C-alpha cells in the first residue's frame, strides 16, 4: 500500500539551511557531490529512503548536464516542491560560481592562484576519503544480489579498461535489469528500503507517492516557462549587443554544450577546449588547463569551467562594454545557459518518473542502472585518486584494453599523508564532513606557508 507525500516534507527554512551546508561541501566532482548528499540526506537526516534516492539518481544519470546538481533539484522538489528544487539547484552551484568568478578575476589581475590552489589541494584528499566511504555504503545498500555486483564490476571495467561510452554502459545495464525482470523476477526483491541499518524510517519512504499529478497541461506550462527563462537572456544580448558579439556566440555555444554533456563534464570538455581555444581564441591551451584545475578545486560541478572560459573570452573581446563588465556578463550568461536546462529537465520529467516507480518493468531497468552507477562512481573515484595523489598519468594499452595509470615517481608525499589522515578521520574517528574538509584545507595551506 502506498502513502501520499505532503507538499512540504520538512520546514522550508530547515531545508534551505541543509542545502546551504551541502553546497559548501560539493568538492570532488559528481562522485564527491553524490556522496555528500547520500550521507546528509539519506544517512544523517533520513529525509529520503535509499531506494527513492537511487531512483532519482538513475533518472538524473540519463540526462545531459551535471547529474549531481540535477539530483539536488530532484530531491529538493521531493522535499519542498518547485521552490525546494529551485533553492536546492541554485545553492548547489552558487558557492562554486562565486568562488570561480573571484579566482577568474584574480587570474586576470595577477596570473597567479598558487595560495588558493594549495588551499584546495588539501581538500582533494578529504574528498577522496568521502568518496571512498560513499562507494562502500552505496554498494552495500544497492548491490543486493551477486548479479548486480557483477553489473557494477562490469560497468567499472567497461569504463576503466575499454573506455566504453557512458550512454552505452547505462543502456546495457537497463537492458540487463529488464531482462532479469522477465526471466528471474525474484532477484529484484528488495528489503524495506530504509537502508537496513536499524535507524528510523525516512520522512519520504520508498513507497510514498508524490503529491504532484503529472499532466500534459502542466508539462506544457513548465516547458514554456523553462524555454523562455533559458533563451530570453540570449535573445536580449543578441538584440542589445549584436548577433556577432562574443556574448551571443557564448550564449549559443554553451546552450548547445548543455545538451550534449552525457556521462559527465569530461565527456564534453575536449570539444569545449577545442572550440574555445582553436576556433574562438577565447584563451590559450595553458589557460584552459589552469581553468580546469580551478574548477576541480572549487565546489560545484566541474562543468563550471565554462564560466572561466567565458570570463576570459569576454574580457578580451568586450565589444562596447568595458573589459570587466564584459567578463562579468559573459561569465553570468554562460553559467545561466549551462544550468537552467537542468531545472527544466527535472521539473518536466520528475512527476512522470515518480509515477513510473511502481511500473515493475521500468523499475527493474532502473535497478540495473543503479548497479551500474556503483561502478561509475568507483571509476570516478579511481580517476580522482590518480589525479590527487600523482602529478602525471600515462595510458597503458594492449589490444582492446586501455587504462590510465599513474606514474609512481610523481607521487605527492604531502597529498598521500593528507589522504591517510582524511581516511582515518572518516573511517576511524567518524568525524563530520565539514570538520574533515576544514582540517585538510588548513593542512594544504600549511604546506605552502612552510615552503
Where are these regions (language model features)?
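Conserved beta-loop-alpha segment that forms the PLP phosphate-binding cup at the N-terminus of a helix
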Residues: 70
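Multi-pass membrane proteins that catalyze or facilitate reactions on polyprenyl-/lipid-phosphate substrates
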Residues: 1-63, 74-298, 302-451
